[in-house]
Amino acid sequence: RRNAKNSETSPVIPSGLNFFIEGDEDFVDDFNSSVISCIAVDEEQLELLSGKFTVQEYDAITVGLTLNTDFGLFSDQGFRKALACLVDREKLSEGSSHAAAYAIVPGEVTLLDKPYREFSGDKLTPDYSVEKSQEYYQSALPRLDTSLFSGARIIMRENETASAMLSVIMQEWQREFGFYCVVEELSEADFSARLSSGDYEIAVQELSGSVNSPGAYLQAFTTDGAGNYSGYHSADSDGLIKAAQRAADLADSAKLYAKAEQSIINGAAFIPLYYKNEYFCINKDFADIYYDPFNKTVDFTNAKAF
């Protein structure tokens, strides 16, 4: 019997509900066979799902090239900018189902209940320009150790989209500068270990935020930011991010974040390539389960089982 002195306004739907967390080795098969009720997957994994289910789509991940600024060549901002100007996003997006990334913060992030990108603009990256790239390169060349132009290691997880884009980008770098890279496809564990230890020159990184805020993405490029794998930081962007976090007015905060984001992109230690969608799928026998694409948590508060 319900306790009248301790009741909720929301009715309790199921008579009983148990939650089990399964290992991720066979999670796609487990979802298809209804062993698990919900699953978060990327686009490639989505194609492997079968049966009836509902889908929530989130644009909360930016895939890009993280340049290790401890590497001799990449300690020079001019050379980094030369490389960034040879990324032709229109060409990269041809034949791809992913939207090209012209900024760091993805479209899922909101401020004032509106997409953050409405305040900051969608396009912050430099235009593809061989001429501009050569200007940066020729200016930086006297400072560069050209013996390092061969063998720079690009580490990445297995990813067909990123591999195809890398092939195009590396051809541009080879043609214009004679800069040759070696791609290493790694397991998730090995990639994470190499990224954390700095044992790489370039990493294909999936940038995500722990909360719904531009600052959660941009802090990865601050002096004391968690996940600052590039080693890049500047007093300008650090100050703008701190000011944005302190701003009482969210519209002012958005403008400050946008300036910080532009400053970081100008530093060219992270070169955005494309936005990667995540899909939260719910088995047909369940409803009202919600997913947070930022902190990767699932809300079962009002879950219903049929």
Predicted features along the sequence, with ranges:
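Short, solvent-exposed loop/beta-turn-alpha elements that line the ligand-binding surface or hinge
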Residues: 4-14, 50-57, 66-76, 111-132, ...
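Ligand-site clamp/hinge motif
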Residues: 5-48
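Pocket-flanking alpha-helical
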Residues: 29-30, 44-51, 189-223, 264
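Alpha-helical secondary-structure segments
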Residues: 61-108, 150-160, 248-267
